[in-house]
C-alpha cells in the first residue's frame, strides 16, 4: 500500500511540473552568434538565448570566445551566473586585463559574478559559456588606465 501511495504521489508531482514551452522558448537548432563590439572585445561572439538584457526580466546569453580572443574589463549592474558549456574558460577579476592572472574554469563550472565587479575573459583556448541574470542590464567598459 505504501509503495502504491508513493507511486501515485510521484506521478501527481511530476504531472504538476509539466510545462508547455511558449513560442519564445521553443526548440531551435542553436543560437546565431554575432561578433561582440570591437571596442569591448576581439575574437568573442555572443547570442541571446532567452529574454533581453534591456527588460526587467530574466535573460540568458551564450558567449563563444576563440583562442586568443579577449573580452576587456567591464562591469554589469546586475549579478550574473556563469556556466561553462564547452572548453576551459579563462576568467579574471580586476580593472586591468591580465591573462596571466585569470582562473581557468573547466567545462561544467558554475560561478557567480557579482554586480558592479570588474571582470574580463581571455581565450587561452576556445570556450563557450552562458551568462544568466535579471535585467535591465548593461555592459560598462572599465576605462583604460
Predicted regions and their residues:
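Glycine- and acidic-residue-biased ligand/ion/polar-headgroup-sensing regions
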Residues: 66-69, 75-96
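Bacterial N-terminal signal peptides that target proteins for export
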Residues: 1-7
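A short, N-terminal "cap"/entry segment at the start of jelly-roll beta-barrel domains
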Residues: 18-59, 102, 144-145
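Short acidic-glycine-tyrosine-enriched beta hairpin
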Residues: 68, 89, 95-116
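Conserved short histidine dyad/triad with adjacent acidic residue
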Residues: 56-76, 104-105
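C-terminal motif of bacterial Sec signal peptides marking the signal peptidase cleavage site
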Residues: 14-16
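Double-stranded beta-helix
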Residues: 100, 120-145
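Extracytoplasmic
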Residues: 44, 56-60, 79, 116, ...
Amino acid at each position: 500500500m505504501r509503495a502504491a501511495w508513493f507511486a501515485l504521489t510521484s506521478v501527481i508531482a511530476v504531472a504538476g511540473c509539466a510545462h508547455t514551452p511558449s513560442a519564445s522558448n521553443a526548440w531551435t537548432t542553436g543560437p546565431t552568434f554575432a561578433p561582440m563590439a570591437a571596442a569591448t572585445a576581439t575574437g568573442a561572439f555572443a547570442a541571446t538565448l532567452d529574454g533581453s538584457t534591456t527588460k526587467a526580466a530574466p535573460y540568458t546569453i551564450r558567449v563563444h570566445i576563440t583562442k586568443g580572443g579577449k573580452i576587456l574589463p567591464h562591469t554589469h549592474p546586475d549579478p550574473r551566473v556563469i556556466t561553462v558549456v564547452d572548453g576551459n574558460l579563462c576568467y579574471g577579476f580586476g580593472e586591468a586585463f591580465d591573462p596571466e592572472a585569470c582562473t581557468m574554469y573547466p567545462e561544467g563550472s558554475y560561478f557567480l559574478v557579482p554586480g558592479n565587479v570588474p571582470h574580463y575573459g581571455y581565450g587561452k583556448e576556445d570556450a563557450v559559456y552562458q551568462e544568466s541574470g535579471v535585467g535591465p542590464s548593461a555592459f560598462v567598459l572599465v576605462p583604460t588606465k
